[in-house]
């Protein structure tokens, strides 16, 4: 172990980020990559597809989703992105814009408030707005 590093110093220098997990929930690696405007290639686990292709938003594609353990598909995605700097830049911008719109504290607070309000309503529990 040579000491701690600040990942922000390195992410922005990368052409792409690759997540080849076989299990994930909400991978922070993707959000960290988007903060640095870096596109992501990720396996189809957890919410990777939603983060990369979007969920009810118009930000555009921010990377590629590949099948788990499909080495040929992962390699193809890497070579496709490596060969097209303009596409990587657009995807990085799309990811950054998605992150800024959907993962700010204010947006997350609003989303959780709506979830709890709807749950309280479904249980016939009164809800006072915070």
Where are these regions (language model features)?
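Active-site donor-binding acidic/aromatic loop of nucleotide-activated sugar
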Residues: 1-4, 10
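A short alpha->beta transition loop at the rim of the catalytic pocket in nucleotide-sugar-dependent
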Residues: 8, 15, 37
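Aromatic "clamp/platform" in nucleotide-sugar-dependent glycosyltransferases that forms part
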Residues: 22
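Short hydrophobic beta-strand element within catalytic cores of glycosyltransferases
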Residues: 39-42, 47, 52
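Conserved acidic donor-binding segment of nucleotide-sugar-dependent glycosyltransferases
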Residues: 53-71, 80-85
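A short, well-ordered alpha-helix in the C-terminal region of glycosyltransferases
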Residues: 73, 80, 87-101, 111-114, ...
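C-terminal alpha-helical cap of glycosyltransferases
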Residues: 105-130
């Amino acid at each position: 172990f040579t000491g701690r590093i600040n990942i922000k110093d390195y992410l922005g220098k990368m052409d792409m980020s690759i997540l080849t997990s076989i299990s994930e929930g909400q991978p922070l690696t993707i959000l960290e990559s988007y903060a640095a405007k870096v596109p992501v290639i990720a396996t189809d686990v957890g919410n990777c597809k939603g983060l990369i292709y979007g969920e009810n938003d118009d930000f555009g594609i921010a990377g590629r989703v590949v099948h788990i353990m499909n080495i040929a598909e992962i390699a193809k995605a890497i070579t496709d992105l490596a060969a097209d700097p303009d596409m990587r830049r657009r995807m990085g911008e799309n990811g950054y814009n998605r992150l800024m719109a959907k993962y700010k504290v204010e947006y997350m607070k609003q989303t959780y408030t709506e979830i709890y309000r709807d749950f309280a309503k479904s249980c016939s529990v009164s809800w006072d707005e915070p």
